Design a protein with these regions (language model features):
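"A position-specific structural signal for the A-helix of alpha-solenoid helical repeats
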Residues: 30, 63, 107-110, 114, ...
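Structural motif corresponding to the intra-repeat A-B loop/turn of tetratricopeptide repeats
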Residues: 5, 38, 71, 122-125, ...
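TPR-repeat structural position
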Residues: 8, 41, 74, 125-128
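Flexible helix-coil transition and linker loops at the boundaries of alpha-helical arrays
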Residues: 16-17, 21, 87-105
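TPR alpha-solenoid repeat register
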Residues: 27-28, 60-61, 94, 111, ...
């Protein structure tokens, strides 16, 4: 109940944040979601890992990969993305909330977008083109995928700034 009302601290105060082998899937999921929403990705990941070990699926793999990128566990993120891309079905969707109006996109597009973000995170200067290519693959599946469009624009802007710096350095 607390979780559905956005009362994440109250939810955690009720059930705690400790990892307990006897916790039900629902308790583990409440802990994972509450910690994620409280911007505690490392702690949330511990609980997501428990859920994933009990029953791995594409949706958990996506969430875990996203948080692993945030916490700089790029190898772990790649493993989760690879698993999810191998097991994703065409009818799977992912909801995004970064705009005023939440929207859905294909889970495959979401995974390709996340793979692009991972590629960029692995080497922020050398991998811009490869990251843009992967995000473009996501946009081929769903041209209205707002987060992918915004991220591509940011990468293209960064690429242009890099080119300007390199041109200025050559002049000197």
């Amino acid at each position: 109940l607390y979780l559905s009302e956005g009362k994440y601290m109250q939810a955690l105060n009720t059930i705690g944040v400790e990892k307990n082998a006897t916790d039900t899937d629902m308790n583990v999921e409440v802990k994972a979601l509450a910690l994620k929403n409280l911007n505690q990705p490392k702690m949330a990941l511990e609980h997501y890992e428990i859920l994933y070990s009990r029953s791995s699926n594409v949706y958990l793999a996506y969430e875990m990969a996203d948080m692993k990128i945030q916490t700089n566990d790029l190898v772990g993120a790649k493993l989760n993305i690879d698993y999810a891309l191998t097991n994703v079905k065409d009818d799977m969707k992912r909801t995004f909330y970064e705009t005023q109006q939440p929207y859905e996109t294909s889970m495959k597009a979401a995974l390709l977008y996340l793979k692009g973000i991972l590629t960029f995170s692995e080497n922020k200067s050398d991998n811009i083109d490869a990251a843009i290519k992967q995000i473009n693959e996501a946009l081929t599946i769903d041209p209205n995928f707002n987060l992918a469009k915004v991220s591509r624009q940011a990468l293209e802007s960064q690429k242009a700034q890099q080119a300007q710096k390199e041109a200025a350095a050559k002049k000197n």
